[in-house]
């Protein structure tokens, strides 16, 4: 069935989109933390129970916490994104993230996952691809999808008709000089099903991305880390560790581009996006704020990027954007010998970094089997995960995340488990330390 929508509907759509991006954190999540670590902060205690195979985990590789507190785990062993609440229960509605496959029905083994404010769940598999699944679309259901539209140039008044999916359509849809005055939507069930399922968001093999990525080989990228800004920024960042003759070690910005208009079962009109190469944020080097064999990445609420790497000479970096020009220029926020977080002696193999809501940094080391914690200024605070700070030894911790309560979640790929820790002086009454 087809129907037309007008410019008035598009204006309503713009309002609707702004509303659907709102994300309310449940009231039962305790976020009354003091901020910086203090002298009274004592020991990281392990929380019971250990989340293991009884919680449907097999080989957890990465972990992310959505703004509603739900926990998303990239589980390479069972080709799934495992979703848990803060009690370890499996909420309904996320069955589409299990047993992941691509368009060729080949299994997808996710190695990283993140969730943005629009309820987009992004994940990567170590290739040049980024996949996505939208929670809101699946909760609401998709009724119709745009198939064509008539666009009008704002200054000249010229009209142009475009078919959805064509180069002309994508160009006009993303050009602020053109607006939709009339469109046609259709309930194409095959297309609806493809959007409801996990699907390809970005592909380095795409001709446009190869063209835009002038100095590197976009089609050979090997994404090792992924992060999505917490607010309304229409972009994600990935670390590329392909290497090769051109030292393709870098951080890449992927921009959102409008691709379709969706009418949900609720009547809301929302955009569907595809990813397009936006630029190399930082490239290869061995000094502060450069990239060499990157492993993971995270972003704070100010847009500062934090990443770990295996190459020379510093395992941990933070870069911050200067937005005064036409495009962001990133500069190192930490310096060797001045900031303890850049001292390589703290780490043997720093695999992942995560931030809490106060920009304190948590770094997991799979060789040392521990977590090293630094405050937002880069000063050392404490170790967690071994010795006096833990009653159980992690075997091969590989990733971590921190929720609004300050609970630290650590993936251990060797025993298919997630360990949880919290400072002993900030334990909630409903959290039980390990006996």
Language-model segment annotations:
Residues 1-2, 20:
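N-terminal hydrophobic targeting signals that begin at the initiator methionine
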Residues 15-18:
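C-terminal motif of bacterial Sec signal peptides marking the signal peptidase cleavage site
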Residues 20-435:
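Flexible "stalk/tail and boundary" regions
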């Amino acid at each position: 069935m087809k129907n037309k929508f007008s410019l008035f509907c598009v204006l309503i759509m713009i309002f609707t989109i702004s509303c659907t991006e709102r994300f309310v954190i449940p009231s039962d999540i305790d976020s009354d933390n003091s901020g910086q670590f203090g002298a009274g902060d004592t020991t990281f205690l392990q929380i019971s129970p250990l989340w293991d195979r009884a919680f449907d985990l097999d080989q957890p590789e990465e972990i992310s916490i959505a703004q509603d507190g739900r926990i998303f785990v990239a589980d390479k062993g069972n080709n799934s994104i495992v979703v848990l609440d803060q009690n370890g229960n499996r909420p309904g509605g996320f069955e589409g993230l299990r047993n992941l496959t691509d368009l060729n029905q080949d299994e997808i083994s996710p190695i990283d996952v993140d969730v943005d404010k629009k309820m987009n769940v992004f994940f990567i598999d170590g290739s040049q691809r980024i996949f996505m699944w939208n929670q809101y679309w699946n909760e609401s259901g998709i009724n119709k999808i745009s198939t064509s539209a008539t666009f009008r140039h704002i200054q000249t008044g010229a009209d142009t008709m475009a078919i959805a999916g064509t180069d002309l359509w994508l160009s006009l849809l993303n050009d602020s000089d053109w607006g939709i005055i009339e469109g046609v939507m259709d309930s194409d069930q095959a297309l609806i099903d493809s959007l409801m399922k996990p699907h390809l968001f970005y592909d380095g093999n795409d001709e446009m991305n190869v063209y835009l990525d002038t100095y590197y080989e976009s089609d050979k990228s090997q994404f090792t880390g992924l992060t999505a800004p917490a607010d309304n920024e229409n972009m994600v960042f990935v670390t590329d560790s392909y290497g090769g003759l051109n030292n393709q070690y870098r951080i890449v910005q992927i921009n959102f581009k409008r691709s379709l208009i969706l009418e949900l079962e609720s009547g809301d009109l929302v955009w569907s996006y595809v990813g397009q190469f936006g630029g190399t944020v930082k490239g290869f080097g061995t000094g502060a704020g450069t990239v060499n064999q990157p492993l993971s990445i995270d972003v704070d609420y100010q847009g500062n990027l934090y990443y770990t790497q295996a190459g020379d000479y510093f395992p941990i970096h933070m870069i911050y954007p200067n937005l005064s020009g036409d495009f962001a220029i990133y500069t190192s926020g930490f310096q060797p010998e001045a900031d303890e977080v850049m001292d390589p002696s703290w780490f043997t193999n720093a695999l992942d970094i995560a931030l809490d809501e106060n920009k304190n940094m948590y770094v997991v080391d799979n060789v040392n089997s521990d977590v090293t914690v630094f405050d937002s200024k880069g000063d050392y605070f404490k170790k967690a995960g071994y010795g006096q700070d833990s009653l159980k030894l992690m075997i091969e911790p590989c990733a971590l995340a921190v929720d609004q309560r300050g609970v630290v979640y650590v993936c251990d790929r060797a025993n298919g488990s997630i360990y949880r820790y919290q400072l002993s002086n900030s334990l909630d009454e409903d959290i039980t330390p390990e006996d």
